[in-house]
Amino acid sequence: MASRSKRRAVESGVPQPPDPPVQRDEEEEKEVENEDEDDDDSDKEKDEEDEVIDEEVNIEFEAYSLSDNDYDGIKKLLQQLFLKAPVNTAELTDLLIQQNHIGSVIKQTDVSEDSNDDMDEDEVFGFISLLNLTERKGTQCVEQIQELVLRFCEKNCEKSMVEQLDKFLNDTTKPVGLLLSERFINVPPQIALPMYQQLQKELAGAHRTNKPCGKCYFYLLISKTFVEAGKNNSKKKPSNKKKAALMFANAEEEFFYEKAILKFNYSVQEESDTCLGGKWSFDDVPMTPLRTVMLIPGDKMNEIMDKLKEYLSV
């Protein structure tokens, strides 16, 4: 799979009128020639740098079950999702690794000795998993996540939606699963299809053998999204202005958004969003980072998977 780096913009100077010719002796002329050669070499180096920045790098990925070796990588990606929110990402990472019959991590295939010295063969480029919030109710991280989404729902939505979300999260007869799919920003979305296909197989197997996460009636997804700065996407205060287009960091999550029965956004503008593995650029238009919370019925997953196959099949 190939990821493409954005080419660096080079600022051009304003042309100046030529100076009058100046007489030089032979030594001065040699020095000028040497300086010109140095300038040529420097220009060549800059051109080579630009070529490197603009080149495509092909990396093959492979999926593995979650293990203790993946702790740091998974936790880092979870921190990228929750930012400064009061969520115990260490405990959440532990819970995901403990239930390693569910979920996968993606790593580079066969890191050779000749590759970049900074490349760690165990580096986690992304992961997918699911945590049954109903089964894990009472653990600190689960309580914190539920409080987080309810708090922002109260700030951004009508009272009826807050009550609806609270009811869904506390109905023990219809478990809600927290769907987590995080990856470096420059990992292409095509990787999502096999990851979700494998997750669906694992969830079906867990349901068949009565293991944790086996049955969820709803999926809760917190997605990294962006809107053009200054645009209002809140549903609490209706406006005649057209809502800004919502852009998804993980492109495939738009299909989940379309099937969600409950959804809202909240801003994370004040928090440090470093965008692991890359930087966002939308034609140099200032963007406001958001988190989009969605609740998707479990019986809609087959339709979503069909969409993923249609758009992400290589």
From Swiss-Prot:
The similarity comment for this entry is: Belongs to the BCP1 family.
Q: Where is the composition biased (Acidic residues)?
A: 25-56
Which Gene Ontology BP terms does the record give? DNA repair; establishment of mitotic spindle orientation; microtubule anchoring; microtubule cytoskeleton organization; mitotic spindle assembly; mitotic spindle organization; neuroendocrine cell differentiation; regulation of cyclin-dependent protein serine/threonine kinase activity
| Entry-annotated residues carrying Phosphoserine | 42, 112, 281
Q: How does it assemble?
A: Interacts with BRCA2, CDKN1A and MTDH/LYRIC. Isoform 2/alpha, but not isoform 1/beta, interacts with DCTN1/p150-glued and ACTR1A/ARP1. Both isoform 1 and isoform 2 interact with alpha-, beta- and gamma-tubulins. Interacts with TENT5C; the interaction has no effect on TENT5C poly(A) polymerase function.
The further comment given in this record reads: HT1080 cells that constitutively express low levels of BCCIP display increased levels of spontaneous single-stranded DNA and double-strand breaks.
Give the protein's biological function.
Answer: During interphase, required for microtubule organizing and anchoring activities. During mitosis, required for the organization and stabilization of the spindle pole. Isoform 2/alpha is particularly important for the regulation of microtubule anchoring, microtubule stability, spindle architecture and spindle orientation, compared to isoform 1/beta. May promote cell cycle arrest by enhancing the inhibition of CDK2 activity by CDKN1A. May be required for repair of DNA damage by homologous recombination in conjunction with BRCA2. May not be involved in non-homologous end joining (NHEJ).
Give the start-end ranges of region Interaction with CDKN1A: 161-259
The protein's GO terms of the molecular function aspect are: kinase regulator activity; RNA binding; tubulin binding
Report the locations given in the UniProt record: Nucleus; Cytoplasm, Cytoskeleton, Microtubule organizing center, Centrosome, Centriole; Cytoplasm, Cytoskeleton, Spindle pole
This protein's GO cellular component annotations are: centriole; centrosome; cytosol; mitotic spindle pole; nuclear cyclin-dependent protein kinase holoenzyme complex; nucleoplasm; nucleus
- What is this organism's lineage? Eukaryota, Metazoa, Chordata, Craniata, Vertebrata
Q: Where is this region: Interaction with BRCA2?
A: 59-167
**Official protein name in the record:** BRCA2 and CDKN1A-interacting protein
Expression by tissue: Expressed at high levels in testis and skeletal muscle and at lower levels in brain, heart, kidney, liver, lung, ovary, pancreas, placenta, and spleen.
Annotated region described as Disordered, given as residue ranges: 1-56
Q: Which UniProt keywords apply?
A: Cell cycle, Cytoplasm, Cytoskeleton, DNA damage, DNA repair, Nucleus, Phosphoprotein
